[in-house]
Amino acid sequence: MFISKSLVTFGRYFMLMGRTFSIPERMRMFMKRYIKEMSQLGVDSILIVLLISFFIGAVICIQMKINIQSPWMPRWVSGYTTREIMLLEFSSSIMCLILSGKVGSNIASELGTMRVTQQIDALEIMGVNSANYLILPKILGLMTIMPFLVIFSSATGILGAYGTAYIGHILTPEDLTLGLQHSFNPWFMYMSIIKSLFFAFIISSVSSFYGYSVEGGSVEVGKASTDAVVCSSVLILFSDVFLTQILS
């Protein structure tokens, strides 16, 4: 029963994506909605990304210094491990998990409300491809802005680590700088950005599917928002394993 239901949901998702990825009929209207979605989904999320990244970067640096530093290890190890954790996992995977809660529920509730208030039906009656009109700008908008959020997250996390060095005196700024620069591999930054593009697609497309497919009333809209966040989070973790293996 569970397998058959999952296959049906999987098929409906691909059918919706087939309708979504078509050439927009009115490019000017599409660009207007595309820019609006970039602002609503991405720019409005910058503050929470910066706040979380700053404090997580500080906490990681403190934990690394306290728990793995020893007289037999170089003093720059804390800075090195902080950089690797921020670049490889936190700024892409964990940050996208956090954004799936904010952005995913936003998308699902918006489209779900439009469905139960028959706004999507009105678009269909007017001959508009509602999936393309409503969903495609969200997917492309989030995929466009997500790499910038990853870069901001990495930079802010490192600033948080410097905060512990200058204010908390956990380690010297010189040792932290030496660790941040040690054996730096630029590919790790590109890998983080590539992973974030996949995660942005998962968040926007899955949340759009659950919101667009709502049947019922306001209770079902809330349930769709919850299902969208849960499913997006699971798929992000699942795909992170394969993307890390492929890109490493």
What function would you assign to each model-found segment?
Residues 63-87, 154-197, 205-224, 246-248:
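Membrane-interfacial helix-loop-helix connectors in multipass membrane proteins
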Residues 41-94, 98:
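Active-site cofactor/substrate anionic-group-binding motifs, chiefly glycine-
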